[in-house]
UniProtKB/Swiss-Prot annotation:
The lineage of its organism: Bacteria, Pseudomonadati, Pseudomonadota, Betaproteobacteria, Burkholderiales. It comes from Bordetella bronchiseptica (strain ATCC BAA-588 / NCTC 13252 / RB50). Gene3D superfamilies: HUPs (3.40.50.620). It holds the Pfam family CTP_transf_like. Belongs to the cytidylyltransferase family. This is D-beta-D-heptose 1-phosphate adenylyltransferase.
Length: 162
């Protein structure tokens, strides 16, 4: 059986950096990142809005090891990085998915040099080191307010309470 078509959007970090450097991904390039452990309506709305800000949306997913370092709980992530990447790649608004093992995506952002970085409305963009980085080459940092207040952590809390 052949792979699902969306799996071609999942790229190694090196493949993604090479594709961007070769101009194979149209600009403006929009970058966002996250854990995306249990994909919910808040995630997909946010990603669709981010995609509308440019020609290409790149999503970087935390590896399982980096999720554990974030302190979200000993049982997190619930879904392995390959599965989280596949679900994101299946979304029509997402053009490319990769993963990163560091605590922050700063190094990857430096390699890709996106035109915009996008985070959810709960981030203060002025305090993020990624903001200064993207601005250093003329890029922008944008916070997208949440239309749907959803949280994987809160959802898991409800499930655990029964």
């Amino acid at each position: 059986m052949s792979s699902a078509r969306f799996e071609s959007k999942i790229l190694s970090r090196a493949e993604l950096v090479a594709a961007v450097a070769a101009g194979r991904l149209p600009r403006p390039l929009v970058f966002t990142n996250g854990v995306f452990d249990i994909l919910h309506r808040g995630h997909v709305t946010y990603l669709d809005q981010a995609a509308q800000l440019g020609a290409t949306l790149v999503v970087a997913v935390n590896t399982d090891e980096s999720v554990r370092r974030l302190g979200k709980g000993s049982d997190r992530p619930l879904n392995q990085v390959q599965d989280r990447a596949a679900l994101l790649a299946a979304l029509g608004c997402v053009d490319a998915v990769t993963s990163f093992h560091e605590d922050t995506p700063q190094e990857l952002i430096g390699e890709l040099r996106p035109d915009l970085i996008v985070k959810g409305g709960d981030y203060d963009m002025d305090t993020l080191p990624e903001t200064a980085l993207v601005k250093s080459w003329g890029g922008r940092a944008v916070a997208i307010p949440f239309d749907f207040e959803r949280s994987t952590t809160a959802l898991l809390g409800k499930i655990r309470q029964g």
